[in-house]
């Protein structure tokens, strides 16, 4: 499983700055979808060869009301379930009572915690950080998140034990190179074959009390009983095998499948980290939304994360029965307005309690998975690229036309198209979006994001041992060029 890093600390110590720096390599993917909220509290990071989930738990006051009451339940859950906690402090402000209250809470939890003294730029860092040793959480690490100083070393130190335990490999890539990595055609082919031999992993996610457990029980059959309060189920999602119409599935249940008597509980413990890990591990994500409440910011945040990791999407609007027609029209209008950035995802209106519309969900799940894993040949992708250029030529860059040469598959789930050419790194985002939409229409991709990446064509003469002209050869060359110009006149 991918490691989870939680950022903890009082307000204004630099958590958001560090969060943005860690996740910035993925922001461009979200920017391709206008209308998606950018105010995210969790995201996927890729730094120095490590991939991990980072969660900003929000600021904690540590006032006299007590830390337990001041922290949101989800922030507490994030600390409980994270693999690593980075406890940020302000080196310029020094040690505060709020810092001590947070440290006391973390000591009681016995979490793997690293104290980070942020904002050490422009001050005597060693003397400023000395007092933070009194927190009793071990070594104090210096960082200037705004400038990026100490960030990479901190992450490497914090994640190395987890990387070794989970078999993650360090490839030594820097931030830029890691994000630009492309699958070769051979790797993409192998990935596609691997996916064909595995069951479809379907993660059912959503806010508390939208009917995830009811829907899961409806899919599995009411007679299926899985005990929720077993050891281990509080941290990890439950993986349930299922066969339907000859297709094998694995349902990843983030809410926990309750006994029938408990399905209608009014309060459900929601775990952000459990949900994010389920999205990471899934092939297709089924987002359940309550028709009576509509799309919430939390839903948009989950959708943004699913897009970032390239998962296929299906949306189920639950509790559709018993709503007046005018309310239904209003809900549909809101969905069109707020979900325009994922117009490729199928939306189903269902009643998990009564089973209405549930069967059709699997048609969209299979369609999305087929789109995400369908093999497309290099010749087909190159032909579509040429058709797109005929419809809309690439722009001029410094007086020269950007030249696109050929395209091939770079990966699956999500489908990745790699286009090779000259000056492609200078292409404007508008043209990149045009190419992405052109491929989506041409390939009839439905239910999954599609990524188009551009790779600079190599210089075939680079590295050749070209000899420098002698003085006499240089003179002869000039005479020949002059002669050619005279003839043209």
UniProtKB/Swiss-Prot annotation:
SUPFAM superfamilies: P-loop containing nucleoside triphosphate hydrolases
Listed InterPro entries: G_ENGA, GTP-bd, GTPase_Der, KH_dom-like, KH_dom-like_a/b, P-loop_NTPase, Small_GTP-bd
Keywords: GTP-binding, Nucleotide-binding, Repeat, Ribosome biogenesis
Residues in EngA-type G domain copies: 3-166, 200-373
GO biological process, one term: ribosome biogenesis
Annotated residues for binding of GTP 1: 9-16, 56-60, 118-121
Classification via CDD domains: EngA1, EngA2
Nucleotide-binding in keyword set: yes
Family according to the record: Belongs to the TRAFAC class TrmE-Era-EngA-EngB-Septin-like GTPase superfamily. EngA (Der) GTPase family.
PANTHER family: GTPASE DER
Function of the molecule: GTPase that plays an essential role in the late steps of ribosome biogenesis.
Name listed for the protein in its UniProt record: GTPase Der
Source organism of the structure: Shewanella loihica (strain ATCC BAA-1088 / PV-4)
């Amino acid at each position: 499983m991918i490691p989870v890093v939680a950022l903890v600390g009082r307000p204004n110590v630099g958590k958001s700055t560090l969060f943005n720096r860690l996740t910035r390599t993925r922001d461009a993917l979200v920017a391709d979808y206008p209308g998606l909220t950018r105010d995210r509290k969790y995201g996927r990071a890729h730094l120095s060869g490590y991939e991990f989930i980072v969660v900003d738990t929000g600021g904690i006051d540590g006032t006299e009301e007590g830390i337990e009451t001041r922290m949101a339940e989800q922030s507490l859950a994030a600390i409980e379930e994270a693999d690593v906690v980075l406890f940020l402090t302000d080196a310029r402000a020094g040690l505060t009572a709020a810092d001590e209250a947070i440290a006391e809470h973390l000591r009681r939890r016995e979490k793997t915690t690293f104290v980070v003294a942020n904002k050490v730029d422009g001050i005597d860092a060693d003397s400023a950080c000395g007092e933070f040793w009194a927190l009793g959480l071990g070594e104090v690490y210096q960082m200037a998140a705004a400038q990026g100083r100490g960030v990479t070393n901190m992450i490497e130190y914090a994640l190395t034990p987890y990387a070794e335990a989970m078999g993650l490999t360090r490839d030594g890539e820097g931030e830029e190179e890691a994000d630009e990595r492309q699958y070769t055609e051979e790797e993409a082919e192998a990935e596609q074959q691997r996916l064909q031999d595995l069951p479809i992993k379907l993660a059912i996610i959503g806010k508390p009390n939208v009917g995830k457990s009811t829907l899961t029980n409806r899919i599995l059959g009411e007679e299926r009983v899985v005990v929720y309060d077993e050891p281990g189920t509080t941290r990890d999602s439950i993986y349930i095998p299922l066969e339907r119409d000859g297709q094998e599935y694995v349902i990843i249940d983030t809410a926990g499948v309750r006994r029938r008597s408990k399905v209608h509980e009014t309060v459900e413990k929601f775990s952000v980290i459990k949900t994010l890990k389920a999205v990471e591990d899934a092939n297709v994500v089924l987002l359940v939304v309550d028709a009576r409440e509509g799309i919430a910011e939390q839903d948009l945040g989950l959708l943004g994360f699913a897009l970032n990791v390239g998962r296929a999407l299906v949306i189920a609007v639950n509790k559709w029965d018993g709503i007046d027609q005018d309310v239904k029209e209003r809900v549909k209008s809101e969905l069109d307005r707020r979900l325009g950035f994922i117009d490729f995802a199928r939306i189903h209106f269902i009643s998990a309690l009564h089973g209405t519309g549930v069967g059709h969900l699997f048609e969209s799940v299979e369609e999305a998975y087929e789109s995400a894993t369908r093999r497309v040949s290099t010749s087909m992708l190159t032909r579509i690229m040429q058709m797109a250029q005929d419809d809309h030529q690439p722009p001029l860059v410094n007086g020269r036309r950007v030249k696109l040469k050929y395209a091939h598959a770079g990966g699956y789930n999500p489908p990745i198209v790699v286009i090779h050419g000259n000056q492609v790194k200078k292409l404007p985002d508008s043209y990149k979006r045009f190419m992405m939409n052109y491929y989506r229409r041409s390939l009839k991709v439905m239910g999954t994001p599609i990524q188009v990446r551009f790779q600079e064509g190599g210089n075939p003469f680079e590295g050749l041992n070209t000899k420098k002209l002698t003085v006499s050869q240089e003179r002869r060359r000039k005479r020949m060029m002059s002669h050619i110009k005279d003839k043209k006149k």
